[in-house]
Amino acid sequence: MSRQTTSVGSSCLDLWREKNDRLVRQAKVAQNSGLTLRRQQLAQDALEGLRGLLHSLQGLPAAVPVLPLELTVTCNFIILRASLAQGFTEDQAQDIQRSLERVLETQEQQGPRLEQGLRELWDSVLRASCLLPELLSALHRLVGLQAALWLSADRLGDLALLLETLNGSQSGASKDLLLLLKTWSPPAEELDAPLTLQDAQGLKDVLLTAFAYRQGLQELITGNPDKALSSLHEAASGLCPRPVLVQVYTALGSCHRKMGNPQRALLYLVAALKEGSAWGPPLLEASRLYQQLGDTTAELESLELLVEALNVPCSSKAPQFLIEVELLLPPPDLASPLHCGTQSQTKHILASRCLQTGRAGDAAEHYLDLLALLLDSSEPRFSPPPSPPGPCMPEVFLEAAVALIQAGRAQDALTLCEELLSRTSSLLPKMSRLWEDARKGTKELPYCPLWVSATHLLQGQAWVQLGAQKVAISEFSRCLELLFRATPEEKEQGAAFNCEQGCKSDAALQQLRAAALISRGLEWVASGQDTKALQDFLLSVQMCPGNRDTYFHLLQTLKRLDRRDEATALWWRLEAQTKGSHEDALWSLPLYLESYLSWIRPSDRDAFLEEFRTSLPKSCDL
């Protein structure tokens, strides 16, 4: 009777194994199929077959002779399911937990251990595995899948403890996860073992590459390029698919750039470009490298190529029905040097760099292309500036207007400003309520007054370029009126305002007022009305004491009006200011405002100040 039972059991085991092997072959056939729909259908059928087989095996009491096959089927099911879904879920963790419980059932160790977590279950199973050598290969495959799941979930502490237990290390002897992964030595697969989609050694190689890359990239992001190098070299030398190798080489290039090795950086970036069609990250890094080297032409060419590359649809290969390196990498991080953003974000970088480097004509064209790209897709939402990498839509409009004015296209700039006003002026009646919300700390400081005021400022400058002095003065006055009307009289400090944001906004407001007052003052000077100009320059000094240009224009006007004593006193004040530090310098200004301030910064300032110093009485000489 027992022989008959054994024969029946052996026959069932053979049938289950044949079914597993057939389903694995079916999945591999699907993997090599060029037809997407057929590929997906074959893989899905194989997955359902494995699910049914696993259900049959786990419907019986756990038995050591059957467990190697059961664990193999579990691993094949998890691998195929994760690859089809392109990610891990809680279901896979439950599948692993159920398998561990089944192993312990054979050792009569189930009991209260069911209440324990996965890590505790693994400790128990690995301690029991010395009594079950026939399960060793299957358990190592299951370890590989558990490691993949924990790595993708960033549970590195649990993963390190699992590998320590697996390697027989002393608890706490090594927390170097890379070293623990290298030390892990999966047993060789037996020739007559059930077929698997991926063996333990293959999983180890994937884990080693994925973790080395993750660790290197994290060190690079946190500002430790020297530490990142060794991990990235480890990733490059491992089982590294070409798309990942492009990223690894780009990260290595970024490390060497930050460490002051531009030639090595360039070699890695060239290697990255040769590895595949994912040209975005290496081209962006190349633009940073050329900017650091001061090669503006090469920098802008790299950015232009990047814009074109981002316009080409990505031709991603169909994923293998395996646990791949890409499956274990973290989602894109905005702080990562490999994040090149969208085509519009890159177009903005190109346009702004052209503006900053004096290529106004190119900047104007790039900004107009950018606005067409943004406005064509959908109605953009106007909101406060987000975190890097780019400004909000109104600031893009303002930067574009600056580029047009600088390129001598004042009429086009006026048209653009009118478009911006039509989109933002409707918000102005709500400003008093928005400022009140900001004062109470319930909402962020509103940026709309800055945008609308800056628009009138740029319109004024465009009219100056067109020779319409009266209209220009009117626009500068409108800018000032809005600034003084919109600014809250009392701003509570402390909890009501984010300090950094408040300081940046205050600096921008001060500099915007100074720019409008100086611009209007210069028009009064041009029309021979020095007294009115003096009033504006005096007010600009009061409004923005950290702006040296305000002192210079005031000093020039006082000298023209022959108010010698006041001019001398102001000169001494300016000298004292030169030796001090100013808070305004700590806060970056919007690009459109920086560009505008450079227009009203007199080129002969230093020569005039030196001439004025030499004209002072001897007792005033330094």
From Swiss-Prot:
InterPro entries: FANCG (IPR039684), TPR-like_helical_dom_sf (IPR011990), TPR_rpt (IPR019734). GO terms for molecular function: damaged DNA binding. The modification Phosphoserine is found at residue 7. GO terms for biological process: DNA damage response; DNA repair; interstrand cross-link repair; mitochondrion organization; ovarian follicle development; response to radiation; spermatid development. PANTHER family: FANCONI ANEMIA GROUP G PROTEIN (PTHR15254:SF2), FANCONI ANEMIA GROUP G PROTEIN FAMILY MEMBER (PTHR15254). Keywords: Cytoplasm, Disease variant, DNA damage, DNA repair, Fanconi anemia, Nucleus, Phosphoprotein, Repeat, TPR repeat. This is Fanconi anemia group G protein.
